[in-house]
Curated annotation (Swiss-Prot):
Residue ranges occupied by any F-box domain in the UniProt entry: 2-48
Species of origin: Bos taurus
Assembly notes: Directly interacts with SKP1 and CUL1.
Function: Substrate-recognition component of the SCF (SKP1-CUL1-F-box protein)-type E3 ubiquitin ligase complex.
Lineage summary: Eukaryota, Metazoa, Chordata, Craniata, Vertebrata
Protein name in the entry: F-box/LRR-repeat protein 8
Gene3D superfamilies to which the protein is assigned, alphabetical: 1.20.1280.50, Ribonuclease Inhibitor
Highest taxon in the source lineage: Eukaryota
Name of encoding gene: FBXL8
Length: 374
């Protein structure tokens, strides 16, 4: 009688196994010879997600280790407060360092809180070494690492990964340690970069001018997070530099996230009329009404998503209604305070492309879930 796996072609089994989590892939490989061959073929491992909780215990040698050469895009999750999870993540990154000819994408995500005063040197050193060896890396996402990223890491990425297409450094650390000089060097070393996430303090007028250079490849996304004291003290980026960048890259989308650390005068410096803002997230400790009105009057042609965290007020309701009337291309709006019914009606009536919204007209228990528009 044929083994169960021999009834299906290896290509079909591979399509199934590629969607299995790591423990289930290991279990499938133990069923029979045909399943073992399918579970370890390259197609199964091109896009791999690994959670470093129980998944790596005893599995790196030999099962996972034998498949590392096949990994092209890796999403790696770990808990920084758990030594076993953290060690598993750094061990895996270290193992990849010597076997990275095919690695194209890396996304790291921390789950839970990191220990107090933890600089994450073990994790960052492993990432640093990996970027020095992964010359074909095209996508690096460090947004969900809770550690301060520095110039040394950015320069390692710049010179070790010349094929880079996207780099996201706009994480939630409260200290900005990436200087404008290293970002400029990154742009010079990676001419194909088309998406970049930074803290505001890491960006300079010179970098905007470099992105607007005639020989530059099309640039598509710039995500800016303003959340640490360095961001609040950052010099203004002139409106004319933004205008030149938008002219050079008409498809450019800018994501702006403004956090409570920004005083009102800093918000005014950041919100320049010529910035092609597609996504605006406002979580300010001061005035929110002014920025919402500014967005309504200057970003009507580009704004696609708005998120507001503020105290409810009649002035905010009026500003939101003005934005609904002007920003007809809006696809998402999420306001995490109670609004009057006319605000909900304004967005439903004036924004025909709206696909998702969080607009509560009465108090409800949290978490608030968005409403999807059919």
């Amino acid at each position: 009688m044929a083994e169960p796996g021999e009834q299906l072609p290896e290509e079909v089994l591979a399509l199934i196994f590629r969607h299995l989590p790591l423990p289930d892939r290991a279990a499938a490989a133990r069923v029979c010879r045909a399943w073992a061959a399918a579970a370890t073929c390259s197609a199964v491992w091109h896009d791999t997600s690994i959670s470093c909780d129980c998944e790596l215990e005893g599995m790196l040698p030999p099962y996972l280790s034998a498949c590392l050469d096949h990994v092209q895009n890796l999403w790696l999750e770990f808990e920084p407060s758990r030594k076993s999870s953290r060690r598993a993540a750094t061990d895996l990154l270290t193992a990849l360092t010597g076997r990275t000819p095919g690695l194209r994408g890396l996304c790291l995500e921390c789950r839970g809180e990191k220990p107090l005063f933890d600089a994450g040197r073990d994790v960052l050193d492993a990432v640093h070494a990996l970027c020095g060896a992964a010359s074909a890396l095209r996508h690096l996402d460090l947004r969900r690492l809770p550690f301060s990223l520095d110039d040394a890491l950015v320069l390692q990425v710049a010179h070790g990964c010349p094929e880079l297409r996207s780099l996201f450094l706009d994480n939630r650390t409260l200290v900005g340690s990436v200087g404008p000089g290293s970002v400029l060097e990154l742009l010079e070393a990676c001419p194909c970069l088309r998406a970049l996430g930074l803290h505001l303090a890491s960006l300079s007028r010179t970098a905007l001018e470099a992105l607007a250079a005639p020989e530059r490849a099309p640039f598509e996304l710039l995500a800016l997070r303003c959340a640490c004291p360095e961001d609040a003290r950052a010099p203004p980026l002139p409106d004319e530099a933004w205008a030149a960048l938008s002219l050079r890259h008409p498809g450019l989308q800018v994501e702006l996230e403004l956090e409570p650390v920004l005083p009102a005068e800093s918000v005014t410096r950041v919100l320049q009329p010529a910035v092609p803002v597609a996504t605006l997230r406002l979580s300010l400790s001061g005035d929110t009404v002014g920025p919402v009105r500014f967005a309504a009057r200057h970003y009507a042609a580009t704004l696609r998503a708005l998120e507001v965290r503020a105290a409810a007020s009649a002035e905010l309701d009026a500003a939101l209604e003005e934005l609904a009337a002007r920003c007809a291309r809006l696809r998402e709006v999420h306001c995490f305070c109670v609004v009057r019914p006319s605000v909900l009606h304004a967005f439903r009536a004036r924004c025909p492309r709206l696909r998702s919204y969080t607009l509560k007209v009465t108090r409800e228990p949290h978490p608030w879930r968005p409403t999807l528009v059919a």
